[in-house]
Amino acid sequence: MEEHIQDRREIAFLHSGEFLHGDSDSKDHQPNESPVERHHESSIKEVDFFAAKSQPFDLGHVRTTTIVGSSGFNDGLGLVNSCHGTSSNDGDDKTKTQISRLKLELERLHEENHKLKHLLDEVSESYNDLQRRVLLARQTQVEGLHHKQHEDVPQAGSSQALENRRPKDMNHETPATTLKRRSPDDVDGRDMHRGSPKTPRIDQNKSTNHEEQQNPHDQLPYRKARVSVRARSDATTVNDGCQWRKYGQKMAKGNPCPRAYYRCTMAVGCPVRKQVQRCAEDTTILTTTYEGNHNHPLPPSATAMAATTSAAAAMLLSGSSSSNLHQTLSSPSATSSSSFYHNFPYTSTIATLSASAPFPTITLDLTNPPRPLQPPPQFLSQYGPAAFLPNANQIRSMNNNNQQLLIPNLFGPQAPPREMVDSVRAAIAMDPNFTAALAAAISNIIGGGNNDNNNNTDINDNKVDAKSGGSSNGDSPQLPQSCTTFSTN
């Protein structure tokens, strides 16, 4: 029996932990060990992996930590290194801290960018406001200068003043024209500005329109007025002292002679143009039509023609009559500055206004014979008719020499032109009764004014009649027609 017991071997059940720890630990976890096992070390050991009461396996150097996230449940396994004693969550915390710092920095940059954007908008608005104010100030300054120039320019008293005034009027714009040509952006910008004087500008336009209604002749532009000059000339053009360049010609209806077009080349951008064409009825007559005003200084040889055309255009646009125009053109200022009028000692221009032309046109005809020289009315009223007639001594000198007639200086110390003297000589040579008629007129005037010197007057008259072979009558004689008109043609 004992032998049978000794040969019997028992099977011992071990837990998984006891199997891994070996025999040294198995003694502590086997409290109900049989006495047979104490004597017999060779026993079969089995591992029970399905034990009901299994204890947690402890490796000794590894422990489990639970990580609870923000969601409330365990979302990770945190392993702690036994050597360093640090957890993997520390790196995640550092990353999250850096991310939150970056978010704060980004928010700060966004806020700063928003402030800078707002500041830029304010600066842009201030700049636009300042620019509108500068434009308004410039416009006001230009309008003030233009108004001042209109006040400083004298009235059309002389042809030279008119000549200097026309280019300014053509180059400068009126305030109404400037406001019409203003761009829509400028108008909108000035209306948006709360400080812009919108109402005064409208009142200024109304006042300008009122002035234009009061002066309808001022609305006509000087550039559109044309002055035609008819003169006899065999040359291609009339020498008016300016330099011209021909830029074209064309045939006109009803005239076999072509019409040539010229522009002034004395200065760059000079707006003056002229058209030259011969008359169809008389080819010796050359018609020159001027348009525009010179914007540059003129030589002395060109001043007379420019002054004449400017005066004619001014009279045309101002609505003056042809008689006033004739007086203006007959003034010494328009005829004494150039040799162009030396062939015309007395201006006998016939001014003709043309209403059928597309532009206001005035024609100055220089082909007619000159009119007789008539002294101004103030000289006649002050000195009387006897002051302009020669005395008896001058008549004797004329009869003795039979060469020249001593004509007193009526209009100043200047001597009469040579052409006039030649014309007088020719008239005296053609009419032998001139001296007799002139002596009779003088005797009648002197005899009626001085009763005390009747005898001397009769003696002088008899001497004159004896020398001239004429007779004096009681009636006042009339001067022959050939003596009252001087022709230089």
Curated annotation (Swiss-Prot):
SUPFAM superfamilies: WRKY DNA-binding domain. Residues 15-43, 143-222, 449-489 are annotated as: Disordered. It comes from Arabidopsis thaliana. Residues 233-299 bind DNA. Transcription factor. Interacts specifically with the W box (5'-(T)TGAC[CT]-3'), a frequently occurring elicitor-responsive cis-acting element. One of its GO terms (molecular function) is DNA-binding transcription factor activity. SMART domains: WRKY. Keywords: DNA-binding, Nucleus, Transcription, Transcription regulation. GO terms for cellular component: nucleus. InterPro entries: WRKY_dom (IPR003657), WRKY_dom_sf (IPR036576), WRKY_plant (IPR044810). It holds the Pfam family WRKY. The gene is WRKY47. Residues 469-489 have a biased composition (Polar residues). This is Probable WRKY transcription factor 47. It is found in: Nucleus. Its main location: nucleus. PANTHER family: WRKY TRANSCRIPTION FACTOR 36-RELATED, WRKY TRANSCRIPTION FACTOR 47-RELATED. Residues 144-153, 163-172, 182-215 have a biased composition (Basic and acidic residues).
